[in-house]
Amino acid sequence: MLPYAEVILFLIKKHCIDCGEAFFGIVVLNALCLAGVGYSLLWHQGPGRSVLFVLVLATLYACLCAFCVVRGERGCDTLADTNLRVFTHALREVWLQSLWCALLQCVLFRTGKYVCTYYFARTHSVFTACGILSAWTYALACGALLWFVPVRARYRTHFRQCVYLSARVFFEHPCITFLMVLYSMGVLALSVPMAFLFPGPCGIVLLWQDVLRTLCFRRAWLAAHEGRKAACAPPIPWEQLMCQMRAQSRAHTVGELFSPWKS
């Protein structure tokens, strides 16, 4: 059995390879998303700014979900060959759930901002405690929604079920979610020299998708051997999952990482 440290290193290595193989798709999608977000935040100051931001956020979710759906169906090594028709079909499949997720995110932001501002503006300790509780509630809700994109791409179910599964993954694996947030912040910091075009958000979501796949594999294995004692239960066959993931990637050298079309 592979130790957990080796599994983590394998996922990080595979993430780097996947980003290299999907370089052009990642750059194009990040450019479109960043242009929309930048316009809604910096240049558009009209009365419809909130509506525009919801639409831009929904577009971001839709692009990320469609990107993951195409990757799950075709494999990361074929993303460079994916035509516009395939991606458009995936967008039509996920746009409604993405819009609901964007609306939910904005409602949470507005509500959390108003409630926290109201409570922290009071000096009484009871209001301060309520403000801290509200801030933690908002943070937990946002943390649960971090899994929405990989959950939607994997299970392809309706919105409420996706939110429920996202919250379930978050509360069952809070430490993993925290580590993923730290890793994502590090990747975003590395994206600064590339103006967040690479790896950026679309590059980060690839690892979230693989981590969710790993967690589901572990959960299914433990559920299949739930009745056995810990001493008698066979170890989790991580090698089997790693072999399946290796088959999804074809570039394994540094040269192929930045020129996958030559592999």
Swiss-Prot record:
Highest taxon of the lineage: Bacteria
Record's bilayer topology term: Multi-pass membrane protein
Cellular localisation: Cell membrane
Transmembrane segments: 21-43, 48-70, 127-149, 186-208
A single cellular component GO annotation: plasma membrane
Keywords, sorted A to Z: Cell membrane, Membrane, Transmembrane, Transmembrane helix
Keyword Nucleotide-binding appears in the UniProt entry: no
Keyword Transmembrane helix belongs to the record: yes
Protein name, UniProt field: Uncharacterized protein TP_0273
Species this chain originates from: Treponema pallidum (strain Nichols)
